[in-house]
Amino acid sequence: MKEMNAELVCGILDEIMEYELAGVVRYTHSAMMVSGPYRIPIVAFLKEQAAESLTHAQQAGELIVGLDGHPSQRIAKINETHRHSIKDILEESLEHELHALSLYKKLLGKVADRSIYLEEYARGLIGQEEQHSLELKAMLKDFG
């Protein structure tokens, strides 16, 4: 196995943690703003995404500590578009998931062949983010 740069990996994990924490805020806000006939199932979906983002942030933070790093107390910047139609919310959610996917792929690039545990962690989260992206794309089909 190759040598792993723990400081670099902690930096990426910190970026992931901050982005996932921003996801908690984004999804919670979005859930509050949904209106219309599909409100109930979409609010439930968004609340589930917020809870999952919190879990992902906590996991990343625990890994940072395990690697002798120190998790930040920041969250990533959240862009407020003031567009709150269901289509807009789902499109912004898809954009969020795709960026999260890119962060986990970035992590995978730095831990592959260096740490089996971190490689499997990254692969698992990549799978989850890909699944969420596919779900959102399917939900957006009705909005043409």
Positions of the model-derived regions?
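Iron-associated oxidoreductase/ferritin-like identity signal
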Residues: 1-144
